[in-house]
Amino acid sequence: MTQIIPALDLIDGEVVRLVKGDYEQKKVYKYNPLEKFKEYEKAGAKELHLVDLTGAKDPSKRQLALIEKLAKEVSVNLQVGGGIRSKEEVKALLDCGVKRVVIGSMAIKNATLCLEILKEFGSEAIVLALDTILKEDYVVAVNAWQEASDKKLMEVLDFYSNKGLKHILCTDISKDGTMQGVNVRLYKLIHEIFPNICIQASGGVASLKDLENLKGICSGVIVGKALLDGVFSIEEGIRCLAN
């Protein structure tokens, strides 16, 4: 069954939203992250997603103490991403009680290290974040979306699916933080070619209709802005995906 996965992006402990990954286009929400996650959990969320934007910019400033507190205080699975660049960072997050670690640019820039991480920590502990943009074909973007690589999305998926990859988080960059609706075509395409990969869809979720369109295609739908802005509630999202 497709799950709704509520997401929080944090900069220096504050809940924020960026538009298309741009730190200059930042909206700060006056929410306590722990209280917000507990609210989401109480409403029925089974998984939570956290992006450490401080750590993404500077790994030496990763918000580990806060992440550990959040992982300990909520009883559902927490997955964390944000510029993970090393095996040590993956281990530190898993040691904090994080269930899954999201790794992105490394998968394109250092496949050897990425494969080592998959092997060492297991495919259930790792989610590959493939941020994609449509050129002539879907290509993967790297470095917090600032540049498009020459790697085609389907080729990257083919490579890693043959190495035991199970979970991906795929974001259509053109949609993220825009509330313009999700790119259903993209997720259908991935699901048809790689039926054994669990897809988490991210970027642009603006309505319950978006959730409905992804039902049965994706294992999870990451929702940030729509929940923070009160477009729909967790309960409504769960009901929509259950029907």
Swiss-Prot record:
A molecular-function term among this protein's GO annotations: 1-(5-phosphoribosyl)-5-[(5-phosphoribosylamino)methylideneamino]imidazole-4-carboxamide isomerase activity
Enzyme Commission number(s) from the entry: 5.3.1.16
Compartment(s): Cytoplasm
Keyword terms: Amino-acid biosynthesis, Cytoplasm, Histidine biosynthesis, Isomerase
Family recorded in the similarity comment: Belongs to the HisA/HisF family.
Active site: D9, D131
Superkingdom assignment: Bacteria
Protein name, as recorded: 1-(5-phosphoribosyl)-5-[(5-phosphoribosylamino)methylideneamino] imidazole-4-carboxamide isomerase
UniProt keyword annotation of Cytoplasm present: yes
GO cellular component term, pick one: cytoplasm
Enzyme class (EC, first level): isomerase
GO BP terms in the entry: L-histidine biosynthetic process; L-tryptophan biosynthetic process
Metabolic or biological pathway, per its Swiss-Prot or TrEMBL entry: Amino-acid biosynthesis; L-histidine biosynthesis; L-histidine from 5-phospho-alpha-D-ribose 1-diphosphate: step 4/9
Catalytic activity: 1-(5-phospho-beta-D-ribosyl)-5-[(5-phospho-beta-D-ribosylamino)methylideneamino]imidazole-4-carboxamide = 5-[(5-phospho-1-deoxy-D-ribulos-1-ylimino)methylamino]-1-(5-phospho-beta-D-ribosyl)imidazole-4-carboxamide
Pfam family, one: His_biosynth
